Amino acid sequence: TKDFVAALLKNTPVFENGGRAATTTFSQRNIGDVLVTFENEANYVSKKLTQDQFEIVYPSYTILSEAPVAVVDSVVDKKGTRSAAEAYLQNLWSEPAQELAANLYLRPRNAEVLAKHKADFPEIETFNPNEKFGPWEEIMKKFFADGGLFDQLSSKK
């Protein structure tokens, strides 16, 4: 698979600094043949930006990508926003919040909401990166640090 990834990187005309920038480059500047991105970005491009001009292809399995959410004591105490931050956190996984997430192309974690939107979110096998590759510190060092696997494979460009 290293050869496949090296070939993929070799054929990448632009390395953007973030997901939305890559989406814009692909969908509005028409640079590139394929956009490898998060599910919500793919749906955003297909449904909002280009009215289904692009086909979304799901891999047979993919990484479980979970965004961390936390109340940062020093920040909320300084700004006086603790109650709002805690209320947000408590309601984030509620059915209405998950419904809103689904409407914004984010895969709901609530099983009932996910079932309601199953046409938009096909079943896909996921894996936990920590179980497969170790702690984040090791993952970052191995794959993304200076001289790491990403640098090695992209230098073959």
At which residue positions do the language-model features occur?
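Solvent-exposed, acidic/flexible segments
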Residues: 15-19, 35, 59-62, 78-85, ...
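Sequence-level detector for tyrosine residue identity
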Residues: 44, 54, 58-61, 88, ...
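Extracellular/periplasmic juxtamembrane helices and adjacent flexible linkers that interface
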Residues: 74-157
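Ligand-binding pocket segment of bilobal, Venus flytrap-like solute-binding proteins
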Residues: 1-59
